[in-house]
């Protein structure tokens, strides 16, 4: 007797798609409306696990980490209005960082929504500002069509988040055994730009007297390091990265690499002003500054010839006119451009390359000297942590087997310089950050990264390290419960200075930029206010982690203790399916209140820190002078 086919429900359309695309997780916080879909993860034949998180912004952050590793859409399941509302911080990050996500939101019963029932609202309006497409399913019959479109659109270049609200009773309706989603349309991202426009861009680059390259996130997502390195060599051009790059957009052992753009108006202007031609490649977030005055002039001086290459029409000429605008995939298009420029390279390229090689050697010595100074300091400087991590990666032969998740926002430069983001040891996705700047992204992301064994750019996630400031870590410490529950071995490093130090630097910038300007004579009572500190009481992170997930760890107080502590933490997470926490006591920067002076510790720690960018070196003598000029090398500002 023939076996009767198992019953299928409308929720199974979701699992049809996940099986086809090889997606193995759904992230979320359980709610009654979501149970029909969550129940589908209980069936082994669906091949999907439900990852329980304790807050929706953790769920979407974890999904972002998963999507970054696989290159496929990650799926989040949220609960009516509060569910999507709780995701907004990281949804904004996902939108700015071009993350392929599909957010499924279980709406209240369709026949009831108009009557404004408990928790219901216009969900599409909540989500659509930060999604490529947002839609609420109108009938159960359109569910397979809508789901196919959602996953197609999330993957289509440039990738991004998509939102679908589904009245929850639709998911429980029985469907026929042969009612399935036929497939998901996949649009290839590998398309080349228009040949005529490529020739136009090549001609402009060949005539450049002092070219500059700005590399945005689309470079890293395209896995286009070698192609951009080739162009930098041909042009003799320094390469700066998008401020708050989501990935490593250029290898840091290439002498053309100059770190990220400054996060200030005059700082950006100083980068561009000495160059006649700027090649802006995959650069989406073009105004990552927080203080701007039109009287100070545009971020890119008007006499700079701008050439664009991007897979997003929105990002081409978004803020300023481009003399040449190539719409195409970066990895597919750059070789065509490179071949043309190679036939007619700009004058002086060889000389500029020689100068940059010398500058790279000098930069290495400066960082070695800075590390030696840091080892003699009373408290821990971030460079000591970064150097210790690099040592572990090298000694344990973890090349292409590590992912560094960065949210130590007061101290990006040491990690960006010392960790081996090189062709031999890493790939663009070996570095994880976000372009949006909404804090609290990294700890959730570490979950999704560690869940995926392999990254699509031929890397592994054997070692996942998350460096995060103490302020940022307090957004979602519930992460530690999920890490323990799912047995994820992640090394968490809290750079703990008991304050919102980045905001203190931001306050200095505001005062310097506006404090004496007509109509803006406001000045704070102190530059070091108590409300920007985290003390009285100081948070005991080890106790919090222990209580939420039984996570072990230790406090580290001096530079001499860092190397052994980092090695212990790395060994622990590699050998155990459990996370480990290092509470690193970073030098406290706040003097006794009230004060309007800058403490010596800040001067020593930051002003002696070598700039990553040696081509456009900025050398002021103190932090307030840096703020006055709007040029704080290596220190981005977030409000």
Residue ranges and their predicted role:
Residues 165-170, 409-411, 585-586:
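A glycine-rich phosphate-binding loop feature that marks nucleotide/adenosyl-phosphate handling sites
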Residues 1-6, 141, 177-179, 302-408, ...:
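Phosphate/pyrophosphate-binding active-site segments
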Residues 216-221, 374-377, 469-471:
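Conserved short loop/turn motifs at secondary-structure junctions
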Residues 14, 151, 199-202, 227-228, ...:
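Generic recognition of flexible, low-complexity loop/linker segments
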Residues 2-345, 392, 456, 461, ...:
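N-terminal alpha/beta PP-like core and its mobile active-site loop of ThDP/TPP-dependent enzymes
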Residues 156, 397-399, 484-490:
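Basic phosphate/pyrophosphate-binding loop/patch that engages nucleotide-derived ligands
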Residues 104, 113-119, 263, 272-274, ...:
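Thiamine diphosphate
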Residues 11-14, 19-24, 29-32, 37-42, ...:
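Active-site diphosphate/adenylate-binding microenvironment
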